[in-house]
């Protein structure tokens, strides 16, 4: 299946791209996509997927799926195990970072 990955801020610096179309397996979850992209762009890519604000003791995902914040347990109760579908748009780096 085909999905689109959109890169903002530091993600675009790490990848050298603003977006790309990706052909991925039918059963791929968000966690698997991070692993695929880490193999292409290195460990720094996967570390950027998680942010920890100074005021918090927990990490947050720096990822949106179809313009929806993946941190929302109401919309995405499976979190990183949320399965991707044909045509999905996965955005990296929409929170924080530099343009």
Predicted regions mapped to residue ranges:
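Ubiquitin-like/PB1-type beta-grasp interaction modules and other compact soluble beta-rich domains
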Residues: 1-99
